[in-house]
């Protein structure tokens, strides 16, 4: 399962859902006591976002923050990997995340944010899939009642 943006790396994508964009913080971060964040909670924080061009949905969020909320320091990173989650935790930063990642790191807490930003979530696969992969994709689509 992946955050899916059609055309990313030339892949095809089967979108399974649109997930609200949330934020992850260290369980020791001052925001971790909250059950939900507002945009103003992010003022004065480093907000870690994946680099521009990786996902158009994240780029919309980034553009809105740059244009309207200079109080938030956007920190770009190249790719989601374990070092990014560790940096969020040890650096006391805020990381763009989704709720499905609630168990991605034992010292991070995922918090919903009061905004309307979402990101597609699903399966990425070759634009020319093997018959086995295509069969799997169709089976998943059927389970999700997406009808391919």
Regions found by a protein language model. Give the residues of each.
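Secondary-structure junction motif
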Residues: 45-69, 133
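Generic structural signal for secondary-structure transition and capping sites
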Residues: 21, 47, 92-93, 145
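Beta-alpha-beta core module
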Residues: 8-14, 18-20, 82-131, 135
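Extended ligand-binding regions for polar small-molecule ligands
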Residues: 35, 40-44, 120-148
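Short hydrophobic segments within beta-strands
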Residues: 24, 48-50, 124
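Short beta-strand-to-loop elements that line the ligand-binding cleft
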Residues: 3, 70-81
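Short beta-strand segments
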Residues: 1-3, 49, 76, 96-98
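Acidic, Gly/Pro-rich loop/turn segments at junctions of secondary structure
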Residues: 1-40, 44, 100-107
């Amino acid at each position: 399962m992946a955050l899916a943006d059609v055309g990313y790396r030339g892949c095809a994508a089967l979108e399974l859902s649109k997930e609200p964009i949330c934020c992850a913080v260290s369980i020791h971060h001052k925001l971790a006591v909250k059950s939900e964040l507002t945009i103003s909670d992010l003022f004065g924080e480093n907000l870690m976002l994946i680099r521009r061009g990786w996902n158009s949905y994240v780029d919309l969020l980034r553009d809105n923050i740059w244009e309207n909320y200079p109080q938030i320091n956007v920190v770009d990173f190249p790719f989601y990997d374990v070092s990014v989650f560790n940096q969020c935790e040890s650096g006391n930063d805020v990381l763009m995340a989704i709720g499905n990642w609630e168990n991605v790191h034992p010292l991070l807490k995922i918090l919903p944010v009061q905004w309307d930003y979402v990101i597609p979530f699903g399966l990425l696969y070759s634009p020319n899939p093997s018959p086995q992969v295509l069969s799997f994709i169709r089976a998943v689509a059927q389970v999700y009642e997406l009808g391919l």
